[in-house]
Amino acid sequence: MIKNRKKKSYTSVYALGQYISMSAHKARRVIDQIRGRSYEEALMILELMPYRGCYPIFKLVYSAAANASHNKGFKETNLVISKAEVNQGNTVKKLKPRARGRSYPIKRSTCHITIVLEDISFYQQYEEYFMYLKKPGCSNENRNLTCYDTYSSGGLWDKK
């Protein structure tokens, strides 16, 4: 079996919340509102939304930002929620006692939530560097364009 190895990302951090006692459908309703937004904007949205699922997601986003600042030294103003996903967890089954010795089953659904934050300051520096290289007066001998030359000349792409 071939395993997909994750590449080590230097610009992203994540926080994972497992077995949160909430329906995955209800958590997705909140997660869809904050996906793709900045860290500060997401916190503001989560504080003002009137759903019960906002508080555990708020804690996860806050934890991911703490991981970013403590482990990798990122600034919180540059963080963006790049990926937020909700997966269904186990269903906890209980029995509720009823009258005359009977019992009714109760199902508590759980979910797993993953929040990934990315630091966009690296991308801005990268774009500034490319803009510098594209200037007409800039001559950089270390620039390697072999992949573009191979693609434009045909090379491997002409053969089938």
Swiss-Prot record:
Keyword rRNA-binding: yes
GO-annotated biological processes: translation
Key words, A-Z: Chloroplast, Plastid, Ribonucleoprotein, Ribosomal protein, RNA-binding, rRNA-binding
GO molecular function: rRNA binding; structural constituent of ribosome
GO annotations of cellular component type: chloroplast; large ribosomal subunit
Compartments in which it is found: Plastid, Chloroplast
One family name in Pfam for this protein: Ribosomal_L22
Cited InterPro entries: Ribosomal_uL22, Ribosomal_uL22_bac/chlpt-type, Ribosomal_uL22_bac/org-type, Ribosomal_uL22_CS, Ribosomal_uL22_sf
Subunit structure: Part of the 50S ribosomal subunit.
Function summary: This protein binds specifically to 23S rRNA. The globular domain of the protein is located near the polypeptide exit tunnel on the outside of the subunit, while an extended beta-hairpin is found that lines the wall of the exit tunnel in the center of the 70S ribosome.
Sequence similarity: Belongs to the universal ribosomal protein uL22 family.
Protein name in UniProt: Large ribosomal subunit protein uL22c
UniProt organism field: Barbarea verna
Organism ancestry: Eukaryota, Viridiplantae, Streptophyta, Embryophyta, Tracheophyta
Designated gene of the protein: rpl22
